[in-house]
């Protein structure tokens, strides 16, 4: 009897110890606080009192432009992009981006659901672990938690997001970390959210008038050199052609004869399924011309193609290296605009497809840049090229958040079209209406880089295209001296009649404009 009672006591002790062990595993072990399942259920989205040890003093940050104050935890770095975002980073541990979004004509739900379309669809390997609505600090709050595939060491692929509605403004806190730093990072996030307080906003500051910058372009290649003197602008063209094979000349030469002008700068596009004919590329340079290629990271026409994830995993290295080797063999300058118009949701490399994380685009840019350098394609000139209007026009989609940095960008591309009124949402915009504010803003952020209008045009419908062209060609050289190259998009695009011969008057206006002294010069010369 005594032995049975003793044995029973041991059983109870064993049971209690086992229960404690199971509870420990559930909280800290695999699948616990550092696992994906825990990301979906830990804290249930409500910030708790932070208990991390403070080895240095926290500091207050006030963003008067967007209107809020927070306390920055020890060890975190802070950057304010006025009117765009406040970015807090703990290097190697976590990143928090704060966006203050006025709602204007939409509801908070519309803003959140459209912004989070990729989460709902599961694009880009995204897995949503939790989403809910609750009340936080007295404000309606929407919370989302998700993960995606890790694409490289140090990649922060665990996300938590808070949207707090204050009157007609949503404060979005987009936070990311990784499994290894989840506990520490979420404590810091809780600390920041506890400290947050909305304030009156002063709005985005006005950009100063740019100083007039006269720049000469001199780029030497193996066989040719590109020279654009001060006070001159080089005209380029996108003319109908077959991608990959190009076959530019049979349509281009007759156009040049009618205009009495040789276009020394041509552009084309490429997707992952594009294979260039090297000989065709070389013919362009042998004829005294320079080429710009828009390398677009998708499979042409594939809907909802989120190939940046596979690109960063190395799946397309062979294609990228083949492009790099071909461009290297050309020897002369090749302009490359990787992932152009990334701030438009018509581009599947936009952050709209990737949980609003613009860092994925920047990682892809750096990845491609590194491969080209490894292949010795030092003649390639990298062009960073947003669209002039972000869509959706939300703070998280601002072009500055996509900028990979001065070290990997050579030129800045501008793109803005006069869409005319072919579609109900279209608006007739004059050249200066498009480019004056854009030029002023870009000169503030990128004044050390030369500019290129990578593609633009005017529609025929909705106004006087001939007068539009005349005013544009007068203003371009008079008011935008840092724009050294301008490329006309000479094609019909849906209902948009961008082609130069959309009317005899438009064609004649362009031909007359090319006669201006600023456009009459030779830019491509033999090296010797």
Predicted regions and their residues:
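N-terminal targeting sequences that direct proteins away from the cytosol to non-cytosolic compartments
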Residues: 2-94, 166-167, 176-209
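Signature of long, low-cysteine stretches enriched in small and polar/charged residues
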Residues: 120-165
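Substrate-binding cleft of secreted/luminal carbohydrate-active enzymes
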Residues: 206-242, 449-528
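N-terminal carbohydrate-binding/catalytic regions of secreted carbohydrate-active enzymes
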Residues: 235-326, 475-483, 491-494, 507
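Aromatic- and acid-rich polysaccharide-binding/catalytic face
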Residues: 263-269, 399-430, 458, 489-491
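Substrate-binding cleft of extracellular glycoside hydrolase catalytic domains
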Residues: 278-380
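Glycoside hydrolase catalytic-domain groove-lining segments
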Residues: 279-296, 411-462
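Aromatic-lined carbohydrate-recognition surfaces of secreted/lumenal glycan-active proteins
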Residues: 369-397, 448-461, 485-491
């Amino acid at each position: 009897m005594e032995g049975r009672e003793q044995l029973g006591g041991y059983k109870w002790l064993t049971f209690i110890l086992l229960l404690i062990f199971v509870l420990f595993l559930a909280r800290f072990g695999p699948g616990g606080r550092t696992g994906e399942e825990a990301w979906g259920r830990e804290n249930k989205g409500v910030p708790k009192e932070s208990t991390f040890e403070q080895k240095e003093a926290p500091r207050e940050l006030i963003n008067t432009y967007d209107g809020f104050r927070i306390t920055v935890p020890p060890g975190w770095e802070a950057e304010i992009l006025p009117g765009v975002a406040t970015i807090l980073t703990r290097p190697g541990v976590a990143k928090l981006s704060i966006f203050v979004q006025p709602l204007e004509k939409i509801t908070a739900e519309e803003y959140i659901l459209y912004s989070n379309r990729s989460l709902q669809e599961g694009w880009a390997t995204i897995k949503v672990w939790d989403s809910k609505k609750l009340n936080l600090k007295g404000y309606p709050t929407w919370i989302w938690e998700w993960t995606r595939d890790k694409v490289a060491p140090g990649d922060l692929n665990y996300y938590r997001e808070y949207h707090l509605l204050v009157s007609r403004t949503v404060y979005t806190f987009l936070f990311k970390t990784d499994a290894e730093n989840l506990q520490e990072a979420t404590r810091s996030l809780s600390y920041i959210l506890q400290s947050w307080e909305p304030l009156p906003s002063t709005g985005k500051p006005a950009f100063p008038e740019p100083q007039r910058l006269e720049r000469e372009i001199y780029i030497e290649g193996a066989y040719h050199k590109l020279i654009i003197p001060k006070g001159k602008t080089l005209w380029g063209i996108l003319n109908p052609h077959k991608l990959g094979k190009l076959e530019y000349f049979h349509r281009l030469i007759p156009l040049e004869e009618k205009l009495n002008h040789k276009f020394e700068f041509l552009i084309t596009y490429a997707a992952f399924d594009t294979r260039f004919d090297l000989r065709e590329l070389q013919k362009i340079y042998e004829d005294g011309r320079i080429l710009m290629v828009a390398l677009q990271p998708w499979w042409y026409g594939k809907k909802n193609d989120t190939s940046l994830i596979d690109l960063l995993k190395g799946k397309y290295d062979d294609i990228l290296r083949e492009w790099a080797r071909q461009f290297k063999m050309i020897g002369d300058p090749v302009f490359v605009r990787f992932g152009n118009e990334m701030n438009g949701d018509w581009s599947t490399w936009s952050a709209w497809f990737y949980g609003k994380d613009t860092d994925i685009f920047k990682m892809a840019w750096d990845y491609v840049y590194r491969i080209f350098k490894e292949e010795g394609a030092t003649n390639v000139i990298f062009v960073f090229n947003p669209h002039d209007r972000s869509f959706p026009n939300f703070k998280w989609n601002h072009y500055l958040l996509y900028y990979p940095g001065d070290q990997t960008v050579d030129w800045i591309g501008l793109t803005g079209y006069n869409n005319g009124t072919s579609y109900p949402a279209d608006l007739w915009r004059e050249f200066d209406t498009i480019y004056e504010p854009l030029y002023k803003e870009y000169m503030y952020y990128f004044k050390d880089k030369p500019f290129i209008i990578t593609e633009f045009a005017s529609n025929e419908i909705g106004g006087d295209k001939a007068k539009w062209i005349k005013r544009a060609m007068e203003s371009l050289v008079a008011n935008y001296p840092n724009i050294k190259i301008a490329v006309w998009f000479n094609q019909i695009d849906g209902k948009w009649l961008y082609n130069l011969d959309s009317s005899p008057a438009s064609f004649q206006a362009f031909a007359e404009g090319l006669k201006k002294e600023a456009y009459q010069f030779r830019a491509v010369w033999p090296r010797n």
